[in-house]
Amino acid sequence: MKLGSDELMTRRAELPRVALKRPVSRMTMSAKMTLSALALAVCFAAGCGAARPSKYYQLTVPGDMAPAANPNPVPITLLIGRMTGSALYREDQIVYSSGGESMGTYEYHRWAEPPTEMIAEIMLRQLRASGHYRGVYSLRSDIHGDFLLHGRLYDFKEVSGSAEVARVTLELELRNVKTGNTVWTHFYSHDEPASAKDVSAIVAALDKNVQQGIAECRASLDEYFAAHPPAPPATQPAAAQPAPQP
């Protein structure tokens, strides 16, 4: 049976459309399965679920306490300036190294404040509480001081090796505000052994090391002023008494 030319052309035109329907359907299903697998892989790689919490640590900062009673304090006003350091120590990361040139930071263990700021605050509180000086204030205050104490933090980190240690290296400098001359310096460097190989033990060792270093610097500063006692402030001349009336 022969088909008319119009009918034959119509059937030929319909055949490709029918043949293409099934591959398109199979490709769509395959793409969906691939996308689902990729989404699961990304989810696992990103650590889907609750994020790991960060832990924060701080050094032991003395509380606001009344200065110790001292009938004869050194007659100066001491200003506590900035403690400078590398960018690592002006941020809140806890730094570690293996004793070589490379250093790293812990991702989920951080300081509550940058180490440079905590150490400056400890110096301020301890020197003020000692009662050894007429006054101890922060450089940020409006108080006029006689001497400025400031310094630089070189090391404040965990050092891994045969034993875990907490290394603190700093240098303090005392400057006469009036003359601008540096009159005293003190360098401190010490490796304090940690009781265990974990971050909490390293923090405890760093804290102990800092307290020991500041105590050593305080003793050296006291020795300087004992050997170079500043002149007491000049007393104001007494007001002239009025002449008696005749």
Predicted regions span which residues?
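A structural "domain/chain start" motif
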Residues: 48-116, 224-246
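Generic short beta-strand segments
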Residues: 83, 152-156, 189-190
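C-terminal or internal capping secondary-structure element at the end of a domain, subdomain, or sheet
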Residues: 165-175, 185-189, 212-224
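Bacterial N-terminal signal peptides that target proteins for export
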Residues: 4, 9-36
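Surface-exposed short loop/turn segments
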Residues: 50-74, 125, 130-181, 246
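Bacterial N-terminal signal peptides
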Residues: 36-45
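Short secondary-structure boundary motifs at beta->alpha junctions and helix caps
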Residues: 102-110, 178-216
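Extracytoplasmic/secreted envelope proteins and their assembly/folding machinery
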Residues: 116, 120-124, 130, 207-214, ...
